[in-house]
Amino acid sequence: MGAGSSTEQRSPEQPAGSDTPSELVLSGHGPAAEASGAAGDPADADPATKLPQKNGQLSTVNGVAEQGDVHVQEENQEGQEEEVVDEDVGQRESEDVREKDRVEEMAANSTAVEDITKDGQEETSEIIEQIPASESNVEEMVQPAESQANDVGFKKVFKFVGFKFTVKKDKNEKSDTVQLLTVKKDEGEGAEASVGAGDHQEPSVETAVGESASKESELKQSTEKQEGTLKQEQSSTEIPLQAESDQAAEEEAKDEGEEKQEKEPTKSPESPSSPVSSETTSSFKKFFTHGWAGWRKKTSFKKSKEDDLETAEKRKEQEAEKVDEEEKEKTEPASEEQEPAEDTDQARLSADYEKVELPLEDQVGDLEASSEEKCAPLATEVFDEKMEAHQEVVAEVHVSTVEKTEEEQGGGGEAEGGVVVEGTGESLPPEKLAEPQEVPQEAEPAEELMKSREMCVSGGDHTQLTDLSPEEKTLPKHPEGIVSEVEMLSSQERIKVQGSPLKKLFSSSGLKKLSGKKQKGKRGGGGDEEPGEYQHIHTESPESADEQKGESSASSPEEPEETTCLEKGPLEAPQDGEAEEGTTSDGEKKREGITPWASFKKMVTPKKRVRRPSESDKEEELEKVKSATLSSTDSTVSEMQDEVKTVGEEQKPEEPKRRVDTSVSWEALICVGSSKKRARKASSSDDEGGPRTLGGDSHRAEEASKDKEAGTDAVPASTQEQDQAQGSSSPEPAGSPSEGEGVSTWESFKRLVTPRKKSKSKLEEKAEDSSVEQLSTEIEPSREESWVSIKKFIPGRRKKRADGKQEQATVEDSGPVEINEDDPDVPAVVPLSEYDAVEREKMEAQGNAELPQLLGAVYVSEELSKTLVHTVSVAVIDGTRAVTSVEERSPSWISASVTEPLEHTAGEAMPPVEEVTEKDIIAEETPVLTQTLPEGKDAHDDMVTSEVDFTSEAVTATETSEALRTEEVTEASGAEETTDMVSAVSQLTDSPDTTEEATPVQEVEGGVLDTEEEERQTQAILQAVADKVKEESQVPATQTVQRTGSKALEKVEEVEEDSEVLASEKEKDVMPKGPVQEAGAEHLAQGSETGQATPESLEVPEVTADVDHVATCQVIKLQQLMEQAVAPESSETLTDSETNGSTPLADSDTADGTQQDETIDSQDSKATAAVRQSQVTEEEAATAQKEEPSTLPNNVPAQEEHGEEPGRDVLEPTQQELAAAAVPVLAKTEVGQEGEVDWLDGEKVKEEQEVFVHSGPNSQKAADVTYDSEVMGVAGCQEKESTEVQSLSLEEGEMETDVEKEKRETKPEQVSEEGEQETAAPEHEGTYGKPVLTLDMPSSERGKALGSLGGSPSLPDQDKAGCIEVQVQSLDTTVTQTAEAVEKVIETVVISETGESPECVGAHLLPAEKSSATGGHWTLQHAEDTVPLGPESQAESIPIIVTPAPESTLHPDLQGEISASQRERSEEEDKPDAGPDADGKESTAIEKVLKAEPEILELESKSNKIVLNVIQTAVDQFARTETAPETHAYDSQTQVPAMQADSQGAQQMLDKNESCQDETPSAAAQRGLASPDRSGGMGSASEMLAALAVESAGVKVSIEKLPPQPKDQKEHAADGPQLQSLAQAEASASGNLTKESPDTNGPKLTEEGDAPKVEVQEEEMSTKSVKENKAQAEEDLQEPKGDLAES
């Protein structure tokens, strides 16, 4: 026990300087321990032998602890204390070791008192000397390093070792102490035997310790196992450490002990004695925190005031006895040790007391410390409190293990099996002689109780262990006010006494005392505070008393704790401190006033009855009572408990009257209940301290009135419920009154429900309540917190009542609003049960109905919102009470209080259960939405992710509700509720308009987090929504998809876009209807196929390679994001053209974003509509954009200025790269280019799709390649042509030249690849034509999503989701699909980004195609590559890098071929396309497509071969990619493990970045890393690509610089297309994020690896954003590269 105490005290020292105390103790005990070891070698040898055995036993006992302990034990037994010490050191064992040393020293002193006297003198002097150091260390405990320096000493080490020995003994004794609970007699016997042999006689002590060690080992097995594995490990570790201490009594053990002790302070929390102390402390605190309420109440009923007095007296007597015994023990061990022991006992008692009491003070700290060995917080607390005593404590801790044991016996009596177990060791024998003797008598039953509790607590915490002792402590201590250190010193004695008093207390004296105190507190406290009001409360009914009692217990365990605190004393005083305000008088009153109690009963009963006649009077009185209860909460607790018992009987005759009044009382109760709830809510913030007590009383008063009104049955209901709530805290106090009455609980609830029907005046009462409650809210603030706990308990009561109430209230729901008033009480309950079931049913029905409802839902939701607003108004009319009650409920039931009023108001306003259920469901959904949306779209997305499972429209509705919310959030909370309801309705009835407003897709973001799940949801949603959207409107689906795609930013953007998007959607709707029928028919075929095939491919690819798909899709998303980084232009251009041309928004962004979203939600139908819209709209949008550019003057000049929009796009990137000044031009260029590009894209897409439809992917790719090369060439030409772009065109010319070269190199092969892939893809391309567009949309939508990504990087995840789903779609067809999608995306992107990086687009196509050809992995890598392609494609030589990476990843040969093909393509197509693009993009694109078709057909035949090779390679690479790309990414990226698969994309992005950075070396290295097999071809390809990468590094920088300008462009575009501005601003942010967003996508892909990449890319982005020299950008890229390497 001394060890436990000293352990805790040491742990205080050790916590401050966990290492230092060890060293100090080692230094202090080195000679002393050695002396004790030498003098008490028999004892030490035995303990060493026993301790190792015990270690084995304890480790076995600790079972779990055996893991770490076995090593320690074995090593310790082996004498390997160094390792073991290192392992075990750092935990509290240092003090435990000190305690062990003391115990051993004490044992050795008792065994060889003479030797120990000599050695003990040395030890004492050394210990004392070291204790000052330990004190300084204790002071330095905060500074363990200093403490370590001070602790350095074999003596200290040996002390710790000795303490370890002691701890072993103590631990054994602790186990005995734990046994003290049940086996404490045995311990007492063994300890007594030890004491009889000599307080510290080592032989007898060792024998007792040996016996107790076995017992303790066994007991600890049960107790410590219960205590927990950590404690087991701690005790086991401590035991091995102890064994080591025994074995390593040598200086090595000391040195190692120092290390150990250094570790031990950390580990000491694990030390068995300190675990016990921790248990004592933590369980003490936890028990106080958790168990005091219930246990106190139980004990309060058990214990009477007399018992408390008796217990206190007994404790005092036992304290005196223990003091005497301690003195004897002190005298026996050594006079030297006696003085330090006295100090140590005092200090340790202070420490123990502090341990015990501090747990109250620092329950949290102790709980926290319990992990570390709560002694540490205690040490800290004790250190704070004991800073004065620490020196003494330290010296005493070292000097007097016996007294520490004694004190711990006292403390152990307190902690009883906590501290007692700790202190039982050696000091336990003397004290056990007295204490166990006393304890066995009194504590046998109490021990069993304690043991069971301790057993429970040991599993939970040490709170109960300490808790029981604190009760004993508190019982004497509280009267003595032992909160101070001085009192703690006195409490040390008390603690000693309390060892047995705990048992006595558990023998029921303390329990009786506790109950007596509670009763007294109830009586006295109630009498002083407001007998009249309590009389009212009590007069109302025993129910109120029961309820008050139960409610007080339910309302706040604090109140029982308050009562118990009086009983338990200062231990609870910290907790009681809050309640003590009311409790102080209560304690006095409780002590004073049984008579006041009777008077209170009498007074309360009549007065309560008097006021009862009038509901308003009741309410007034209730509020008065509330105010009275505010002051008399504690008295109310005890009073209501006793009152429930006495007054319950007295009032039972009165119950008929009350029941007669029940209608009134129910009304008042309802009003009171609502007012309670409101007042509690209102007062929750106001009432926390004393007000809490008052609050408890007011709660009791209110609930008393409730229950009184409700009748005795209501009382049992509330009482039972409270009892159930209390049941955990104290079933006895609440349970006993409620046991007899509880039967009628539901009846009372039903009655409560029935009077509600009767009480139509409730509205008046509620109105009165509203005003009264407003007043009471002021009064009830204190009641609030009590209510908070009460609410926590009461919700169940409400549920129970609601169950009965639901039966009638459900019927009543159709009743007037009065019922709704009751509903505030009921609805929170009724909806909960009906809520979920009805919600599910309604969700299912709505899920079915949602499809048709989607369009009308918005209008319906508007009507519903009006109705709901009306309902809310009705609820308000009902009184603020409905809202108030909702607010009151919301904490207990639904976090969204506003939603609840809507629920209730809806239920009230719409009595029909169906309506109520629907509204509840809606409200329920809304709460989620309301809560989630406010919480964050991510959380909302998470919520919606599950909701998406419910219905895709649920997401849309959520989005809609989100938009509605955004609109209505400004409205009153009722309006918010209405909005939530409307949102729920919107969810239920999806509305495309709102959906567009709610476009934010972050729900999918949350879903995207679970990509597979998202894909599943998306597949379901895609199929359902695609069908729905196809059937209903492709636009809503597109909107929904877009919302899903970029909900957060798009929500803002689409708010801006909404008009445009609406216009664009209208245009889409109109345009798709027109041209879409043409090209749209093809897209319909493709889109439908894609929409259909997408789910199929989604399903298959998901299963096939969800990760790869996710990674690939994410990489594709990254690629597209990077492309958007490149094409904040394309996406911005798309966005601009989209924003500028709302139709282009549907076109390019819808084509792109819609396709992605289509992939996400309704990518199928949406992509079809989007593709139709894109193509038709792109043509029309190109026109419209050309027209819209006139609308957007900035864009008009760009478009009009640059008839060759691809060049502008190139210029646009260049502009973005070069200057914000170019940004306006960029916006212009984007719009114009986007319009034309979209036009070209539209026609080209049409043509491509026509070619695709006719020629297949090859013609598409021919068109794509041609168009890309056209765009590239034209872009280059136009770059050079446009003055704005000229400077940019210089870079872009270089970039273009490089990229074109790359594409010419790569593109011809990749054209063939693409052709082949498209050839392979035609199968999927018709199916995935849209996924390709989906990839397109991700580009533009990634502009949004990236813009959104700037706002919320998770949007790219949604984009990823789109891409993932696209990839899911294309994963099976990943090679083809990805190639196709990438090609199409690149086509669209190239079209839109044409100016940006046609080559880059080509590069994107090439890497994407390569990747897709290579496989899903290469999609990952090409996506990785493509991700860099975003910025790096923007760099346009990055495609080289990208190409090298994928090529290197794929095959150097393939890469070289692809590079050659791409270059050829880019050369062929760029050259042919350059002029036509400059001349007429559409005609040129068409002509080029036609021209390209032959070439593409040739390429197709070649591609077919290449694709077969590439697909085979992709398949091979797919496997390789898992290995090789992992190796590649792994090798290339230092970010190996997590990055391997996921970071393959991000790493390859980084690799590409690095390739740009490292250029040739990185590319070559990457290639070599990618695949050694490919390294050959990769060498050349990577060299070319590396050279291009060098250029692309600069280009990439400029291109990445472009996103910052897109920000400017976005700002300028914000003038016209604010959505684009947002998309671009965020796209530029995401441009910077582009690498981030690739990483955002990537990190989600490669959560670990990508994160560094994100940083790198962020740095790269920012570096590129610097818009400095390519060299600078490259250097910056290299810096992020270094960062990547670092990361």
From Swiss-Prot:
Pfam families in the cross-refs: WSK (PF03832)
- Reading the lineage from the top rank, the first entry is Eukaryota
Its localization reads: Cytoplasm, Cytoskeleton; Membrane
Please name the PROSITE patterns in this protein's record. Answer: AKAP_CAM_BD (PS51893)
Q: Where is this region: RII-binding?
A: 1498-1511
* Post-translational events: Phosphorylated by PKC (in vitro).
The residue ranges flagged as biased composition, category Low complexity, are 30-48, 268-282, 417-426, 499-513, 727-744, 1618-1630
Bias kind Acidic residues: ranges: 75-88, 247-259, 334-344
Specify where the region named Involved in PKC-binding lies, as residue ranges. 254-544
Chief localisation class? cytoplasm
The listed location of motif AKAP CaM-binding 1 is 594-614
Motif span (AKAP CaM-binding 3)?
784-804
Positions of modified residues (Phosphoserine) = 11, 18, 22, 27, 136, 204, 235, 245, 268, 271, 274, 304, 335, 350, 371, 469, 491, 507, 509, 541, 544, 585, 599, 614, 616, 631-632, 635, 638, 683-685, 736, 748, 770-771, 789, 873, 1059, 1289, 1348, 1352, 1354, 1543, 1571, 1637
Which Gene Ontology BP annotations are present? adenylate cyclase-inhibiting G protein-coupled receptor signaling pathway; cellular response to interleukin-1; cellular response to tumor necrosis factor; hepatic stellate cell activation; modulation of chemical synaptic transmission; negative regulation of vascular permeability; positive regulation of ERK1 and ERK2 cascade; positive regulation of hepatic stellate cell migration
Bias class Polar residues marks the residues at 52-62, 628-639, 717-726, 1035-1045, 1130-1157, 1530-1547
InterPro entries with a match to the protein in the record:
AKAP12, AKAP_WSK
Give the bilayer topology: Lipid-anchor
List where the motif AKAP CaM-binding 2 lies: 743-763
Answer yes or no on keyword Cytoplasm: yes
Phosphothreonine modification sites? 331, 629, 871
PANTHER family referenced in this protein's UniProt entry, alphabetically: A-KINASE ANCHOR PROTEIN 12
Name listed for the protein in its UniProt record: A-kinase anchor protein 12
Q: Where does this protein come from, organism-wise?
A: Rattus norvegicus (Rat)
Quick one: which gene encodes this? Akap12
